């Protein structure tokens, strides 16, 4: 069976991995998944990530914990294949009054809502992380 929404699968693996106190989670890799993992690492939500394998690359994400608790409290998919959500720069949402982030896919790449607002860009809202 083919995967209908690989990004939702990635977010679910991260959520389930942290709920089970796993050190790392692995998944099939793609350019978009690597870009999302890079944003999560820059914002401090995950420890690290690496890509392994040549013919079928796997993305391994090392999860982050603080005093035994998961750093990611909630992670949810917003725009999905059946319902894409696009926002202009002045419509970009603030997650938890600025305490969380919205991951946005723009014409200049994948970035946080703050970075997109600063660059004056809108785009597709991929997910919310808090």
Curated annotation (Swiss-Prot):
Q: Please describe the quaternary structure of this protein.
A: Part of the 30S ribosomal subunit. Contacts proteins S5 and S12.
Q: Which InterPro entries does the annotation name?
A: Ribosomal_uS8, Ribosomal_uS8_CS, Ribosomal_uS8_sf
Name the species this protein comes from: Proteus mirabilis (strain HI4320)
What's the protein here called? Small ribosomal subunit protein uS8
Query: What does the entry list under GO cellular component?
Result: ribonucleoprotein complex; ribosome
Q: Which cysteines are joined by disulfide bonds?
A: none
Q: What is the lineage of its organism?
A: Bacteria, Pseudomonadati, Pseudomonadota, Gammaproteobacteria, Enterobacterales
In terms of SUPFAM superfamilies, this protein maps to: Ribosomal protein S8 (SSF56047)
Record's function text: One of the primary rRNA binding proteins, it binds directly to 16S rRNA central domain where it helps coordinate assembly of the platform of the 30S subunit.
Top-rank taxon: Bacteria
- Entry-linked HAMAP family: Ribosomal_uS8_B
The entry assigns this protein to a family as follows: Belongs to the universal ribosomal protein uS8 family.
Tell me, what is an example of a GO biological process annotation in this record?
translation
* Gene Ontology terms, MF aspect: rRNA binding; structural constituent of ribosome
């Amino acid at each position: 069976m083919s995967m209908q929404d690989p990004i939702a699968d990635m977010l679910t693996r991260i959520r389930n991995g942290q709920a089970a106190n796993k050190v790392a989670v692995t998944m099939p890799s793609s350019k978009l998944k690597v870009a999302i993992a890079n944003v999560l690492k820059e914002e401090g939500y995950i420890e690290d990530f690496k890509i392994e394998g040549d013919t079928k690359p796997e993305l391994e994400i090392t999860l982050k914990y603080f005093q035994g608790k998961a750093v990611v409290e909630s992670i949810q998919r917003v725009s999905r294949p059946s319902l894409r959500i696009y926002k202009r720069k002045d419509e970009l949402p603030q997650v938890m009054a600025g305490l969380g982030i919205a991951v946005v896919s723009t014409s200049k790449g994948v970035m946080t809502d703050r970075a997109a607002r600063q660059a004056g860009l809108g785009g597709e809202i991929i997910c919310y992380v808090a």
